[in-house]
């Protein structure tokens, strides 16, 4: 009897158990995961997973670009401090050239990365059509625009620093030419000023000897001074040779310095030209985004006008309904008739 009673009271409640488990699983883990893919729709879970991967990839690229722009700005501030030095004897040309090349390469790489990020965002916008995808597209467009403006400001600042550097180099060159021309006009060598004395000594040597004219009284006065005057000419020639050797040694140094300054100036000017092209490209991208924003603004204005028109029409219809008493009486009679039919025939 007990066995029969146990068999009659048995009931399979596996379906209820699975339903409870499914409900708890959805309430605890609403997001799709790898371990519960068999319980849900595989296609929807795959789309959500791909969406999350694309979103994380976009955020990763945007964060890397923002960090690189910040590092480039720090290097640019260091370059600005070096370029502000106006002393001829404290001119870090080598360090300025190295920083200029590094910053130019970083700005070019950032520009390429920003173009790739914009293409990646456009590919994401083409895939999504619902409201959620449109919100994400608006957010990503805002991030890209912010990065564009930051890179544009950095490029403009870099161009201003290079322009200031070019002006300082031109000022230094004009000063150097001014001092070199003054030095060539007014020589400060004391031996050069003694050239008239040497001419006098040569003239005294060309005068005929006193005893040749028969005047023996002046011979005792002129003969002792001739050796002294003759000894001054070798010293003068030696000093002139030393001066010429020093000038010949200074010529290669001046040529090397002038060549280095010319190369530095040419590098700065070519960098400014490349930055102008990058700045023009960024301005074109920003203007395109501005045109898109203008079109969106116009669409929003049209939508707002349509909503206001619909609201006015609904308010007018509401006023017409509320003022129609005959319609209210009809509705009241219909309700009374329905209630009477329900009470007499159904209940």
Curated annotation (Swiss-Prot):
Residues 347 are vesicular. It is a single-pass type IV membrane protein. Residues 255-317 form the t-SNARE coiled-coil homology domain. Residues 1-325 are cytoplasmic. The chain crosses the membrane at residues 326-346. Its main location: Golgi. Gene3D superfamilies: 1.20.58.70. The keyword Protein transport applies. Residues 177-191, 213-222 have a biased composition (Polar residues). It holds the Pfam family SNARE. The keyword Acyltransferase does not apply. Residues 172-191, 208-251 are annotated as: Disordered. It comes from the Eukaryota. Residues 237-249 have a biased composition (Low complexity). One of its GO terms (cellular component) is Golgi apparatus. GO terms for molecular function: SNAP receptor activity. Keywords: Coiled coil, Golgi apparatus, Membrane, Protein transport, Transmembrane, Transmembrane helix, Transport. It is found in: Golgi apparatus, cis-Golgi network membrane. Part of the t-SNARE complex. This is Syntaxin-32. It comes from Arabidopsis thaliana.
